[in-house]
């Protein structure tokens, strides 16, 4: 086999090895219409999804019958059984919630980058758990920074959360705000978004990421 032939063979082999979808992070969302607490259910859901990410995990919940705008969250570095104790789960009262297990593809592996992200903004509170990557992160980050956004993390999930929060100021519902934000974010992703009263799931237009 000639040198050129070997190079072609190596390139072909490399292509075959990498020509697969690489899916990282696990997202979970639940809304119990009967009003039951969901933290433990989310925990076991994350436990089942833990093969998708072992760096960090977190849960955010809200009680739809409780004070409007209250979202409780707990997250940390490590596996589910390292981050959550039975007492932690018991203290998280709420019948709507989202959860996340992280495998970092963008941003460093730190507690600040653990999800779900919870934002307080003029319209209330927003929780977000996201899997995937955006391809226009630098442009969106610069656009948000020009309007005064202060970033607490290095992950593109925060950009999505900011885009939704900013859209919500002009849109009548959280659902409409998510749809509006999705017009501007580009990439392969899936996400679950919660307000204190609503739970929304979304995927990129091509449905690359599982949900």
Specify the residue positions occupied by each region the protein language model found.
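Conserved short alpha-helical segments that host acidic/polar catalytic motifs at enzyme active sites
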Residues: 2-211
């Amino acid at each position: 086999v000639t040198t050129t032939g070997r190079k072609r063979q190596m390139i072909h082999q490399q292509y075959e090895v990498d020509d697969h979808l690489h899916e990282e992070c696990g997202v979970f969302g639940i809304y119990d219409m009967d009003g039951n607490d969901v933290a433990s259910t989310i925990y076991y859901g994350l436990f089942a999804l833990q093969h998708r990410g072992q760096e960090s995990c977190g849960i955010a919940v809200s009680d739809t019958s409780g004070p409007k705008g209250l979202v409780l969250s707990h997250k940390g570095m490590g596996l589910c059984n390292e981050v959550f104790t039975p007492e932690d789960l018991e203290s998280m009262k709420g019948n709507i919630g989202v959860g996340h297990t992280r495998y970092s593809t963008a941003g460093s592996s730190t507690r600040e980058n653990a999800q779900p992200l919870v934002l307080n903004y003029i319209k209330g509170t927003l929780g977000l758990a996201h899997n995937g990557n955006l391809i226009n992160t630098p442009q969106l980050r610069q656009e948000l920074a020009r309007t005064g956004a202060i970033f607490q993390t290095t992950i593109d999930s925060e950009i999505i959360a900011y885009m939704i929060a900013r859209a919500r100021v002009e849109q009548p519902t959280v659902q409409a705000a998510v749809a509006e934000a999705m017009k501007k974010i580009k990439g392969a992703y899936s996400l679950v978004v919660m307000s204190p009263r609503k739970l929304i799931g979304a995927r990129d237009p091509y449905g690359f990421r599982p949900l």
